[in-house]
Structure formats: C-alpha cells, structure tokens
Amino acid sequence: MSATFLLVSTLSLAGATENTSLINPEGATWTLHPHYEIGTLAPITHRIQLGQAGTDFNFIADGGQDNLFQFQRFEMWFQKNGRHHLGFLLQPCDLRTTTEAYKELQFDSVVFAKDTPMEFRYGFDYYRATYMYDWRQGTKETLSFGMAMQIRNATLDFRSLNGELQNTNRDIGPVPLLAAAGKFERENNQWWGFDAAGSFAPIKYINGSNTDIVGAILDASIRGGLHLQQGADAFVNLRYIGGGAEGTDNTPDRGKDGYVLNWLNFVTLSVGFEFQ
C-alpha cells in the first residue's frame, strides 16, 4: 500500500506548476536522488546442485518457479556537483514455492523420497554500494562508469512440508563489480536510460570466496520514461538479473562436501520513479 501511495503521489506531480526540484535546492553541491521500482519477476532458467551426489535440480520445471513473483528495488543516489555519483542499493529476492517431489531428490546428504510434499525457499537479497564518474557533467544527460561492491545474503531452504527433513544453506560474501549507467534526452519530455553492473570471477577472493569457485553476475536494465514536474521522472523498466557459481568450497559445513552449482536467468518488468 505504501509503495502504491508513493508512486501515485509522484505521478501526481505532473500537474504541478514549478520546475524546480522537489527535494534539492538550486545550486547545491550535494544532491539526493531516490529511485524506486515495483513490478514482476519471471524466472527464465534456474538450476541448482548441492553436493557431488546431489540432484541437478530445475527450479522452474520441478520447484514451482514456473510463475511470476513480486519485484521491488530501492536505490538512493548522492551526487556531488553533478559529476561524482555515489549510490546505495537494496535488492530483495525471496522466492518461496511449494510442490511435490516428482522424483527422488538429494540436496547435500539429505534425500527426499518421490512424492514428498516440498517447500522451497530461494532467498538471494543483495546490497550494493557504487561509485561512478559522469562524463556528461554540465548537460541534462549522463554517461557514467565506475565500480561497485555488492554483498550477497543467500538463504536456500529445501524441506518437507511435514518438517521431518530439511537442508539449509546460508552464505554472506562480498562481490566486486564494474558498473555503468546512462540517461539520454528525447523529444516531448521523453528520455531513455540504462544501467549495468557485473563481473566474471574464476579466481578466489575476486568472487567473494576463499576457494576457486567460478562466479558470474550481471544486473542490467533499459528504461524509457517521462519528465514530470519538480524534478520527478516516471519510467517503465526491463531488467535482466543473471549469473551464478560452480565449484567446491574447501571449508564446507559439517556433513557437506562443499560442491555447489547454481545458475539462473531472471527477467523483471517494472514501473518506477526517481527524483532529480
């Protein structure tokens, strides 16, 4: 309800009479730029295997992810003199599904018999701090490049609905990324933009792990929008979120051999707003 209220309130600014920013004083050295998206997430592909003897599990075909999920994205950007961009992102991702095991399933050392009613949770929230330098400073357009540090907060649960069997995995780790973004003007108060952050890391420490696990991530979008009044912009956004990891951790949890394979491709469609 609060997200809907914020979006409606922002769109209502189209009827305002002033063109000055609603939140930033004219000529300020530092300016604040909130960004919010709400929409739907569609898993396109999603595979996972936990343990060398574990099942190569298809979340979409066998795990109930053949559906649409709610999507939200929260960002706050600070700009110094319009050139230095410092951003903070909260990206929730918590996919919970229920189905029955169509065949015997094994995750690490836990085995679920065929036809077991199952509950799955794939939680992969991430938090990101980004610095970018704008090469189009002094114009209404932006073209920025920089680096980011992302913190993954993963929670993977596989359990029987009767509570007798469960496999759970937790992981928190840093992931360095390269980042880019742009925003370009069109006619009649229209604009389009993009953002992207990603990395490919086959080497330990670079991928936020202490072992040679291959990891990759790409979070990229393209959007089109309208300039409203008082520095508000509304837009429609198409986003791709993909990546994963494969390898063996040399310090596994007790009862596990440390092997993990996890690759996914998600697409989101959202509407949103931001303030200049």
Feature roles, as predicted:
Residues 83-86, 139-143, 188-192, 230-234:
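Repeated loop/turn-to-beta-strand initiation elements of outer-membrane beta-barrel proteins
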Residues 36, 74-80, 129-133, 147-151, ...:
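Residues on the lipid-exposed face of transmembrane beta-strands in outer-membrane beta-barrel proteins
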Residues 172-187, 195-203, 209-210, 216-218:
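A contiguous pocket-lining binding segment that forms or flanks enzyme active sites
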Residues 13-93, 268-276:
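Short glycine/proline- and aromatic-enriched beta-strand/turn motifs that initiate or cap beta-hairpins
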Residues 44-69, 92-125, 151-173, 201-214, ...:
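Extracellular/periplasm-exposed beta-strand and loop segments of Gram-negative cell-envelope proteins
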Residues 156, 191, 272-274:
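Membrane translocator/pore-forming domains, dominated by Gram-negative outer-membrane beta-barrels
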Residues 33-39, 87-91, 144-150, 195-199, ...:
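Transmembrane beta-strands of outer-membrane beta-barrel proteins
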Residues 2-12:
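Bacterial N-terminal signal peptides
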